[in-house]
C-alpha cells in the first residue's frame, strides 16, 4: 500500500498543471475601487464632522466667515479674468505684431472698480481711494456768473431802516396782540368751567386743553408787555432827542448821549410806566426782584474756600 501511494505522488508531480494567470488591470481596478470607497467614507465622515462643528458654531462667527468669503470671491474672479485677458492680449499681439516692431503698452488707468482696495475697519477711518483717475475733459471756456440768492429787504435799493416809519406801518400788530390776548383769556375761562363739570373719560383731554390755553396766554401776555415797554422807551428817547434839538436851536453845541446815560434814562422811564400802572408798590417789588437777581449772580461768582469738616469733640 505504501508503494502504491508513493507511485501516485510521483505521478502527480510529473503531471502537467494549469497556470493561474491574473490580469494586472483587474488587480489595479480592485485596488482603486477600494481606495475610492475609503476616500468616499472619509469625505462623508469629514462632512459629518464639519456639519456638526458648524451647527455648534455661534451665529456671529458664521456671519464673519460669510463676509470674508464674499470679500475673497470678487478678488479671485478678477484675478482669473485678468489672467485670461493677459493670455488673450499676448496671443493677439503675437499674431498681429511682427517681431522687432515693439510690444503694445497697457493702460495706465482703468475705469473699472478696483477690488484690491480693502474696506475700512470702521466708519471713522479714512477712505482709501485710487490715485489713477483720468483727467476730466471739461474746460470752462466762458465764465458763467453764479446766481446768488438775495433778500430784497436788505438790498441797497430798499433804503435805510427807519424805526419810526416801521412802527407806523406795523402799528396794527400791537392791536392784534391785545385782541388775541382777550380772546385767549375768554377761551381759557370757558375751558376751566368745562373741566370742573367734565366726566371722568373726558377729564384728561380737557386738562390738556386748559394747559395749552394757559401757555398760549403766557406767550401773548409777554408779547403785549414787550409792545408796551418798547413804546414807553421809544417815547422817552423821542422826548430826549426833541429837547436836545430845541437846545441846539437856542445855541447849544453838539452833544451825543452816552450808553450809560441812555441806560439810566430807559430805566427811569420803565419805572415811571410801572408806577403809573401798579403804583409805588409795583415799583418796589420790581426793584427788590432786580436786587435779588444781582445778589444771586454775585454769590455764584464769589470764590469760596475749601469746606472744612468739623470734628466732634467727645
Swiss-Prot record:
GO biological-process terms attached to the record: maturation of SSU-rRNA from tricistronic rRNA transcript (SSU-rRNA, 5.8S rRNA, LSU-rRNA)
Originating gene: RRP36
Coiled coil: 173-224
Family to which the UniProt record says this protein belongs: Belongs to the RRP36 family.
Region (Disordered): 1-136, 239-258, 274-314
Keyword Coiled coil in record: yes
Organism: Laccaria bicolor (strain S238N-H82 / ATCC MYA-4686) (Bicoloured deceiver)
Acidic residues: compositionally biased ranges: 1-12, 76-93
Biased composition (Basic and acidic residues): 94-119
Biased composition (Polar residues): 46-56
Subunit structure: Associates with 90S and pre-40S pre-ribosomal particles.
Keyword Ribonucleoprotein: yes
Protein name: rRNA biogenesis protein RRP36
Domain of life: Eukaryota
Record InterPro entries: RRP36
Compositionally biased spans, kind Basic residues: 290-314
Alphabetic keyword roster: Coiled coil, Nucleus, Ribonucleoprotein, Ribosome biogenesis, rRNA processing
Compartment(s): Nucleus, Nucleolus
Source species taxonomy: Eukaryota, Fungi, Dikarya, Basidiomycota, Agaricomycotina
Amino acid at each position: 500500500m505504501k508503494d502504491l501511494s508513493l507511485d501516485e505522488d510521483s505521478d502527480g508531480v510529473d503531471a502537467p498543471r494549469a497556470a493561474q494567470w491574473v490580469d494586472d488591470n483587474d488587480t489595479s481596478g480592485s485596488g482603486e475601487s477600494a481606495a475610492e470607497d475609503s476616500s468616499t467614507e472619509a469625505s462623508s465622515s469629514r462632512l459629518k464632522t464639519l456639519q456638526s462643528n458648524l451647527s455648534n458654531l455661534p451665529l456671529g462667527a458664521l456671519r464673519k466667515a460669510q463676509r470674508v468669503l464674499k470679500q475673497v470671491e470678487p478678488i479671485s474672479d478678477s484675478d482669473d479674468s485678468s489672467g485670461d485677458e493677459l493670455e488673450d492680449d499676448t496671443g493677439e499681439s503675437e499674431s498681429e505684431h511682427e517681431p522687432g516692431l515693439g510690444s503694445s503698452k497697457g493702460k495706465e488707468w482703468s475705469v473699472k472698480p478696483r477690488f484690491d482696495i480693502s474696506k475700512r475697519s470702521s466708519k471713522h477711518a479714512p477712505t482709501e481711494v485710487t490715485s489713477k483717475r483720468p483727467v476730466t475733459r471739461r474746460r470752462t471756456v466762458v465764465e458763467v456768473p453764479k446766481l446768488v440768492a438775495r433778500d430784497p429787504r436788505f438790498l441797497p435799493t430798499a433804503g435805510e431802516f427807519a424805526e419810526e416809519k416801521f412802527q407806523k406801518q406795523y402799528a396794527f400788530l400791537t392791536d392784534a396782540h391785545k385782541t388775541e390776548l382777550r380772546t385767549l383769556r375768554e377761551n381759557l375761562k370757558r375751558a376751566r368751567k368745562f373741566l370742573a363739570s367734565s366726566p371722568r373719560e373726558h377729564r384728561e383731554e380737557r386738562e390738556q386743553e386748559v394747559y395749552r390755553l394757559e401757555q398760549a396766554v403766557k406767550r401773548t401776555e409777554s408779547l403785549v408787555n414787550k409792545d408796551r415797554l418798547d413804546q414807553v422807551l421809544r417815547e422817552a428817547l423821542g422826548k430826549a432827542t426833541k429837547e436836545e434839538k430845541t437846545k441846539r436851536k437856542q445855541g447849544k453845541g453838539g452833544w451825543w448821549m452816552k450808553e450809560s446815560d441812555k441806560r439810566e434814562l430807559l430805566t427811569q422811564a420803565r419805572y415811571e410806566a410801572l408806577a403809573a400802572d401798579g403804583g409805588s408798590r409795583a415799583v418796589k417789588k420790581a426793584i427788590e426782584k432786580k436786587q435779588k437777581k444781582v445778589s444771586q449772580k454775585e454769590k455764584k461768582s464769589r470764590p469760596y474756600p475749601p469746606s472744612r469738616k468739623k470734628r466732634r469733640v467727645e
